[in-house]
Regions:
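Residues in well-ordered beta-strands of folded domains
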Residues: 9, 38, 141
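Alpha-helix boundary/interfacial micro-motifs
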Residues: 17, 21, 58, 181-183
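Active-site nucleophile-His-acid catalytic modules used for acyl/amide transfer and hydrolysis
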Residues: 144
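Generic alpha-helix detector with strongest preference for long hydrophobic helices that associate
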Residues: 6-9, 104-111, 175, 179, ...
Length: 210
């Protein structure tokens, strides 16, 4: 009886350890973790070049939602399945949480003409505040640093998160050249270019982030 209890106790500890295990970048590369594209976090963003951002209410209430929805609505252009070389069934996109989170973003007071950057620490602090529906696997979020009309470029921190703990397991600043017809598509073009840049960096990541 004592031996049975001991075995049960050890097995329970093993299950607890498995449940609390954090995913890492090697788990992504090996296909052991499912990946959820969470979308775009605009709460840290500034909008550089006042002439390019004349309707802050529309940016917050319309475009932030639209930019995120494009990730699910147009997977051929915005899916991360191919850039991250994911297997069938390993990838999904779920942007609802970011759409809700972005309601706290302040656009009007963050339209500027000066240069602006954020730190990795700011990225981590923002991620720590997320309320996430998915609790298993690795989440990918673009913590947007700036939409820079002067440079015609979108700057974002591509951030990989262990969904269970909300721990940032890797983040890197990447830029995407904006381009497209109309305000929404112009900046969505920057997201598309960031996706392409991820594809070009994947091989290097898989070798160095072990």
């Amino acid at each position: 009886m004592i031996m049975k209890k001991l075995v049960f106790f050890v097995f329970t500890l093993f299950l607890a350890a498995e449940a609390s295990a954090q995913f890492t970048m090697p788990d992504l590369f090996s296909g052991k973790a499912k990946v959820v594209f969470l979308g775009l976090d605009f709460t840290q963003a500034k909008y550089i070049g006042r002439i390019g951002f004349t309707d802050p209410a529309a940016i917050k209430n319309q475009h932030m939602v639209s930019w995120n929805n494009l990730i699910e609505a147009e997977p051929k252009k915005f899916s991360l399945e191919k850039p991250l070389k994911l297997k069938d069934g390993q990838y999904t996109a779920q942007v609802t949480d970011m759409i809700k989170y972005n309601k706290a973003a302040n656009v009007e007071d963050n339209i500027i003409d000066d240069e602006y950057t954020i730190t990795e620490d700011k990225v981590k602090k923002s991620v720590a505040k997320y309320s996430l529906t998915d609790k298993d696997g690795i989440g990918v979020v673009y913590v947007v640093e700036s939409l820079n009309k002067t440079a015609e470029t979108l700057y974002a921190w591509v951030t990989f998160i262990d969904l269970a703990s909300k721990k940032v397991i890797y983040t890197e600043k990447i830029e995407g050249k904006a381009g497209g017809f109309g305000f929404r598509n112009y900046w969505a073009g920057g997201v598309y270019k960031i996706n392409n840049e991820i594809a070009s960096r994947y091989k290097g990541w898989s070798k160095t982030l072990k």
